[in-house]
Amino acid sequence: ATREVKDDIAETLRLQDPEIVITGFDRPNLYYRVETTRRKDAFVADYVRSHPGESGIIYCATRKNVDKLQELLTEYGFAATKYHAGLSAEARRKNQNDFIYDTAPVIVATNAFGMGIDKSNVRFVLHYNMPQSMENYYQEAGRAGRDGLPSQCVLLFSAQDVIINKFLLDKKDFAEMDDEEADLLRQRDLQRLQTMERYCQTTECLRNYILAYFGEHPTAPCGNCGSCNNDFDEVDMTDAAKWMINCVAELHGRYGKAILFGTLQGANRARLR
């Protein structure tokens, strides 16, 4: 937990000068990776296909995505089940047991799944959507590799994830709080979301990024994450760069960034015609 969370726990439990024992946040057997893609369904299907028989959790932000992705994997012939709060208690219990006992090695779920689940041989955790906070991501990704064997934690990122999460944050109910307290919590949630967005976009060591967030400061890159191993898509941007430079030159410095960006994006607005 971060210092803020530890302080909240102590305050809630009314602890006076508690002794705090921290075991460390590093999980060396976990390989962290961010994949920026709009073709998430295809990526997930290819990933599961390339890891036959392995146990994995795929987290989605919404029940709708859980239902859609589980149905897609089933159509492709994968033994995949699902879990979210919209299912009956009986269905949740059955699907959870199918996953635990490897009847269905893959489970697609919202963050309602995982608390109290003790399954050591989870080889991968995929996040179909970016979580709202590093705390959530660390906890959910950490369900991989509890047996100490190498396991992968892959986060699929697109700009749409930020929009979805902001929408979900806007729906949070602060009715029982006064306006000042509610505003503080909204700002906190937004800052946490921005931290996750930076994680998805950084080229720095992903493990060190996570550890630094939780107050640890490694002195060297881990050598075992997507950033350290250069798991990036290389795209030749030469033509695009020339196009942008020509566009700037054609505008002769007479217009601001809004007009420039609109022109580059091909926006159909009156001022650009």
PLM ranges: what are they?
Residues 2, 203, 253:
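Flexible coil/turn residues that form the inter-helical turn or adjacent wing/linker of helix-turn-helix
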Residues 195-218:
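Structured, non-catalytic alpha/beta "coupling" segments that mediate domain-domain communication
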Residues 64, 159, 210, 266-267:
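Short glycine-enriched loops at secondary-structure junctions
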Residues 1-180, 191, 215-218, 227:
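Helicase motor core with emphasis on the C-terminal RecA-like subdomain
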Residues 43, 195, 243-246:
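Pre-recognition alpha-helix immediately N-terminal to the DNA-recognition helix
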Residues 154-156, 183-186, 196-199, 233-235:
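A short, ordered amphipathic alpha-helix with a cationic face
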Residues 22, 122, 202, 236, ...:
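Short, surface-exposed helix-loop/turn micro-motifs enriched in polar/charged residues
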Residues 163-164, 175-181, 188-190, 206-208, ...:
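Accessory DNA-binding and partner-docking regions appended to nucleic-acid-acting proteins
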